[in-house]
Amino acid sequence: MYLKRKVYDQLLDWKNDTVHSTLEVNGARQVGKTYIINKFADENFRHKIYINLFDLSGKQFMECYKKATDWTPGTKRPEQPLHDAFKLFDPDFEDTNDTVIIIDEIQESSEIFNRIREFTRYFQAHFIVTGSYLGRVLEPEFKFSSGDITSIRIYTLSFKEFLEALDDQLFQKYLSLPLDHADDTVPELYDELKNVYDIYRQIGGYPKVVETYLNTKDVEAAQKELVRIIRIFLNESMRYFDDITDISVFTNIFLSICRILLREKKGLDEDSISEELQKLVTKNYSSNLSKATCYRAINWLYHSGIIGFCGKITELDILNFKPGSRCFFMDLGVAYYYLSRTGATVSTMDGSLNENYVYINLSKRQEFPEEIIFETPAFATYKGGEIDFVAQTLKTHIRYLIEVKAGKGTASTALKALEQGKANKLLYLKGDTKGGTVGNVQTCLLYTSDAADDLI
């Protein structure tokens, strides 16, 4: 089953760019990287070579690489050993602009990863490298070549992509809805969209999970597939840790993230989310887990695309920006799965899931080419209160205060900050409204705006 993905357009932009670079495609395990890259390659290049360093093709290529690069001192050096390696692997290989070489799971070999600069500079062929656990390339033996790489991140399906896959007619109606006011002629449309969003919140956007739901229309069956994906990730992660022997360590971190998100008292007791998580995990689960190991596990989850960090702007002073002050999940289905295991009430879960949804969409808009400023999405404190998110456009410099509400409530802290000139606009993203604009305060449905993507 083909699920239409927005990232396909980014792949085309890379191919057509006059700057010749190696494309690094990153993203969490099972987000569909291999499928979309191979589809793109098949449709846009005359010849494709696919190597997965995690399976037999990788083993075979490494044998070709070793044979092509072997050299005895005192003898003539090979003129093009890297070209020879690909020729040994695929006798039909030609170094032309219409050839693409895909090296999957690149993190499995520092030797090949460190050749990226040469792939970029000495080949006419295009190179795409990808991996699910690129956190490993931060280790010393991996030499990063930033000037030769264009990076693209593939996320799980967005709500828009899920809606289009589920019901194209409903998707077209969704696109026609006005964002700045209510359309009272189609009340049933708002109800339909809310129902789809509720399903999306429960299952998230992993392609196999979405496919399962599309085939069965069964939320529980889709969640079962999600659990399978989570377990694959946890078990595979164990390969990269010598001092973690039980996958429950990662589960404990996930549950601790949920409990921090569910707290009524805002802010952290510790200086960073990593320190707060380490304290919770060792207190509630394993006092034998070292601080260093816990930090590495959290970092691993971040670089594997499972969690993301959120900054904090103290007293709405953008010069007082503190990164890594909160943590969110990068897929709504994963967030739902773990939040539902904390014993939280439905209304409390709703609030956390909606905030997580907005976080994911703001994160996407900070990928190149960036549309909003700051290193990561950020929340803010002001006059003893808190504002869910602050976003400022890169081109127009308009600053938005964003408040996420499950119902029809208002946000006194954000209103106060707006009145005192701390921002240009206040944007309410609500679960129970049809939208509207009053002055510089705009309200819209969470799921009709795809988390402010068309507003800011």
PLM regions: where:
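Sensor-1/coupling segment of RecA-like P-loop NTPase cores
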Residues: 122-141
